[in-house]
Swiss-Prot record:
InterPro entries: Chaperonin_GroES, Chaperonin_GroES_sf, Chaprnonin_Cpn10_CS, GroES-like_sf. CDD domains: cpn10. Together with the chaperonin GroEL, plays an essential role in assisting protein folding. The GroEL-GroES system forms a nano-cage that allows encapsulation of the non-native substrate proteins and provides a physical environment optimized to promote and accelerate protein folding. GroES binds to the apical surface of the GroEL ring, thereby capping the opening of the GroEL channel. One of its GO terms (molecular function) is protein-folding chaperone binding. Heptamer of 7 subunits arranged in a ring. Interacts with the chaperonin GroEL. This is Co-chaperonin GroES. GO terms for cellular component: cytoplasm. Belongs to the GroES chaperonin family. It is found in: Cytoplasm. It comes from the Bacteria. One of its GO terms (biological process) is chaperone cofactor-dependent protein refolding. Keywords: Chaperone, Cytoplasm. PROSITE patterns: CHAPERONINS_CPN10.
Amino acid sequence: MKIRPLHDKVILKREEIETKSAGGIVLTGSAATKSTRGTVIAVGNGRTLDNGTVLPLNVKVGDVVIFNEYGVKEEKIDGETVLILSEDNILAIVE
C-alpha cells in the first residue's frame, strides 16, 4: 500500500535502538526506551498559510530526524509500523 501524507504531515520509520546494555544484559519493559530518531519515508506538500500560500517542508524523503514523541500517531501499513507527525514535532535533521 502506498501512503501519501497531507499538508505538513511527515511519515517516519523509527530507528531501532540497542536492546542490550553495555554489559550485555537484554533490556525489556521500561528499561528499553523507544528511539526518537527516524528516517523520513514520505512528506506532505507543505503548510498552507492564512493567505493561501503553500510553504514547502524543510525535511525530505531519506532525512534522518530527531522528533518529539508528543503528538505522534503510530500506524501499521502493510505489517510495518510507521509514525505520522506534523513537521512541527521534528526537532532536528541529523547530518
